[in-house]
Amino acid sequence: MTMTTDPATVDCTPSPLVRVRRKPGRARYDMAAVHAVLDAAPFSHVATVRNGRPVVLPMAHGRLDGSLVLHGSHAAGLFRDAAAGSPVCITATLLDGLVLGRSARNHSMNYRSVTIHGHATAITEPDEVIAGLQAVVEHLIRGRWQQVRKPSTAEIRETALWRVPLAQASAKTRSGSTLDPDDDRCLPVWAGHIPARLVFGQPIAADGLPPGIEPPDYLRLLPTAPAAPPPVSSSRR
């Protein structure tokens, strides 16, 4: 993805701020685990406190030099909060499946998640803005940066990018089936887990696209759903 350091060489130290207390056996604090979730998650949710009230917004992100890069507008209240020194909490979550237990209490989900605590710092140097924007674009669609027009000097000035170090981060995952107690295993209720994943539909061309411009090959790397079977026709006798 957009990493420039070896994830095996940098680990998160689990401070009390990020240490997982509920189901701690599902937690990981190494950078490889944190990076893997961030790279797979299409976007993240960023939380801050504004006028004494919590605010959470979804944002596009990328990874660069041990930091998470966030892309938004200079006018966004979230970035004004960050400029004023407000700490941020960032989460990214992937739904991997539904877990159906035999009792109402034992329903759950399989997931991969990351939580990050820190402060956001504005990226202002033109070269760093370009590198940060490349990280965000390549996270969205790998291979896209090489094909599109690069930002102009004016666009670089107008682009709002912020970085949050990954020094305080934790990953947490759940996989597998239901954990029903032995007493429930005899109940006549279906139990198990249903895998889930994000899939994409067929590309739809923008209005005004000149004839002959086909979808790029890298779009074929996106996961797609299996084609639906043709409808079964019936005839009345």
Model-derived segments and their meaning:
Residues 4-10, 32-35, 53-67, 99-113:
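Short N-terminal helix-initiation segments at or just after the protein's N-terminus
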Residues 1-17, 124, 128-237:
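C-terminal edge-of-domain segments
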Residues 42, 57, 64-66, 84-88, ...:
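A generic structural signal for short beta-strands and their flanking turns/coil linkers
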Residues 14-69, 80:
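An N-terminal domain-cap segment
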Residues 74-135:
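Short, structured beta-strand-loop surface elements
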Residues 44-46, 68, 120-121, 169-172:
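Short beta-strand segments in beta-sandwich/barrel cores
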Residues 1-21, 63-75, 111-120:
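N-terminal short leaders/motifs
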